[in-house]
Amino acid sequence: LSFGLLFAISSVVFRKWTPNARLGMAALCAALGLYGPIFIGELGASENDTLITLFVFTPLLLLVRGLAAESASRTGLVVASLIFGMGTGLKPTIAPFAVATALALLAVVRSWRGRLTALLIWSAAFLAGFLITNGFWMAKLWQQFHNPFFPFYNDVFKSQWANISSYADRGVVPKTIGEALARPFAVTYPTDYAARSYQVRDLRYAALVVLLGWIVVGWVFRRIRERKKGQPWPLQSLSVESRFLLIFFVASFVIWQAMFGIFRYAAPLEALAPPLLVVLVCDLTRRSVARIALVTLLFVSTFLAVKPMDQPRLPFGESFWEVKVPTAAITDPPNTLILLANPRPWAYLAAFLPPEVRWVGMNNNLTKVVDQSHTQMAIRALIYGYTGDMFLLSRNKPSVWHDYDRLVMTAYGLQVVESEWWPIESKHSRPGLRLWRLRRAEGAPGGSEPAPPPIPREPAGGPPDPP
């Protein structure tokens, strides 16, 4: 699907070429667009960054076709915006591309009245699409947590069920303008950003920046010279659909950096880079031989430089899930509680135990045992008042437990019964998982006694905890 959409977009961009050249270059651009660190790296992985790009490519195709035909209809704009809104409702990380699309439309529409009309139509249809896929869940979240985006933007809505925080992952957002300007080059060689982005390598962003910078510098000098002769600006020589895509790309890159900076969220830009490389090369030189040579050099270099995201892979087997859990340990499922104090993503194991078993995740991206949110208050009330069987899911030796395991044991007055544990086998986690039976320490509160607060400290770290 992505290949077909990219091929169609590229075909529109190269519509003035000869049929064979247009189809050949469109196919080449689509292939190179999908041969990138993100699309290759996420094949067979659990992320959905590449799948959601369908909600970016489809609206872009509708818009560039309308711009190329000079007959862009309001219906096409509504449909494109509606699709974009639905995609953003499914995965909000594509919001920067929706904003960039609106900015690109404002830039290529000639009249102020047309711009205002396009903006109003785009905004209304986008909101409708967003509510189609996300409205129900926003209402549920508001009803339960008084935050329609829970837990995100909780610094605005201030739900008592989470910390007063935006919960945004801004760990790789550029801190300075210089860092932002250097970001396209940060994945061309080993850097801290490349390492934090699954050891990726890619030249396409750097190549685009170099070409664009070259053209802008040349444009400045030519503009000074041609202004006296009344010549149009050089960038006006690009077709309207090419200018639209170029503005979209630049605006998306800027907004994406400001909001996230997370490499895999830029999957649409990775795929759209090849046709824009060709557009910039064609604007840079009019000589056919030079164009062919430069495009060939850029495409071959980009192809050879690609290093996909370094994702852990599972070997092929009879079943994706190969999990063995100790069902014999669960003698009374409705009265069984399993605690996950370690922040590792082990909750998938719940699907392999009886559905009546209750699981509580105490330390994760949403909440920590040291928090004072309603979530932790509910967890404390549950644990202190629980009279059934309790287990801890952790490593096979207390000496390699995470500090959060120890904190939970101490805070709630719990102890493991060292003679009662059961191994868990899963190819999705490192060997050594165990289900430990828990008991209350002598003198620890429990049953009908009030729940004291947890230890008010944050763990210092603890031994490394591999997946």
Ranges and model annotations:
Residues 6-37, 54, 243, 247:
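Transmembrane-helix signature of polytopic, membrane-embedded enzymes
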Residues 97-130, 138, 275:
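Perimembrane helix-loop-helix junctions
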Residues 120-191:
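Membrane-lumen/periplasm interface segments of specific transmembrane helices
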Residues 48-55, 87-92, 96, 243-246, ...:
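Hydrophobic/aromatic-rich transmembrane helices and adjacent perimembrane loops
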Residues 18-20, 59-76, 109:
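Membrane-interface transmembrane helices that cradle and orient dolichyl/undecaprenyl
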Residues 2-12, 186-235:
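Hydrophobic, aromatic-rich transmembrane alpha-helices
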Residues 76-92, 98-103, 132, 146, ...:
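Membrane-interface alpha helices of multi-pass inner-membrane proteins
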Residues 297-367, 459:
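Membrane-embedded, lumen/periplasm-facing catalytic core of multi-pass transferases
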